[in-house]
Amino acid sequence: MANTWWELQISCESALEDSVSWRLEDFGCRGTASESKGDSCLVKGYLPIFQAQLLDLAALGLWLQQDALCIGLSSPTLTWQLIDEEDWASSWKQYWHPQEIGDRFLINPAWLPSPENSDRLIIRLDPGVAFGTGNHATTQLCLESLEMRLSEVPKSFISKGGNQEPVIIADIGCGSGILSIGAVLLGAQKVYAVDTDPLAVQSTFSNRALNEVNPERLVPAEGSVDILKKLIERPVDGIVCNILADVIIQLVPEISEISKPSTWAIFSGILVEQSTSVAEALEKHGWVVATMWKRKEWCCLNVRRT
């Protein structure tokens, strides 16, 4: 049974899609997929059989009902079944299609041909079991924020000869590597990508090769900020971090140690109601929130050093 997975299926109102996806990820699902049909939505999540028993699944059903009740929507319906690993690895792919994000990106599933004559930056992606397909609001907000940051080069990044200084970025909680690859395509000279999940790091390596990114420009590693401190030669110019709010708050002191006065950062994975707590933690360690972008119940904080 080691290669057997739970497939969880949640039928819900479309307005609950992000909330259900977040709940599944928090529950430990290694991958999620969703399909919208009018005002309704089917969200699927996958996790190894050893990670949950039937009582755990019943508790998940109650949490989903409570989440819906809190925002005045009808309760979702949760069903589950056991599937083999081979079926799990391919079952969600039928729901994922090419997606434009922001003004410049196109996320293209690796198993589909790349569109011809596109003027967008194409990220070919096979997330495997890692978070980050471009479907989630937080990933979209981070990519759009990277567009803004890397198209507006600060004067401090311009050398005396008028040339742009190389931009070094840290991606904390890299997942599939989608944000790291996006940063490289936008012109970042080098991205250090870390994740505590070894499967996410493996996915980033695979997607780096899939997009033919020079290994010198994208360096994945297992770990967190402690590993970044060993990898980087100097403080980074930019930081992108799309993980849960509680984890961001815990990491803020360490993140500040790898920054310099001109460093900017992008934080997401934050529910709107959690934004104040995250902003307060950042301000205590010398950061100021420049803008907060919202999408559905999620937000993204664009910050800089004070």
From Swiss-Prot:
Swiss-Prot/TrEMBL catalytic activity: L-lysyl-[protein] + 3 S-adenosyl-L-methionine = N(6),N(6),N(6)-trimethyl-L-lysyl-[protein] + 3 S-adenosyl-L-homocysteine + 3 H(+)
EC nos: 2.1.1.-
Highest taxon of the lineage: Bacteria
The keyword S-adenosyl-L-methionine appears for this protein: yes
Locations listed in the record: Cytoplasm
Binding site for S-adenosyl-L-methionine: 139, 173, 195, 242
GO MF annotation list: protein-lysine N-methyltransferase activity
GO cellular component, one term: cytoplasm
Pfam short name (any one): PrmA
Keywords assigned: Cytoplasm, Methyltransferase, S-adenosyl-L-methionine, Transferase
CDD domains registered for this protein in UniProt: AdoMet_MTases
An example Gene Ontology biological process: methylation
Role: Methylates ribosomal protein L11.
HAMAP family: Methyltr_PrmA (MF_00735)
Family membership: Belongs to the methyltransferase superfamily. PrmA family.
Protein name: Ribosomal protein L11 methyltransferase
Organism (species): Nostoc sp. (strain PCC 7120 / SAG 25.82 / UTEX 2576)
Upper lineage: Bacteria, Bacillati, Cyanobacteriota, Cyanophyceae, Nostocales
Gene name for this UniProt entry: prmA
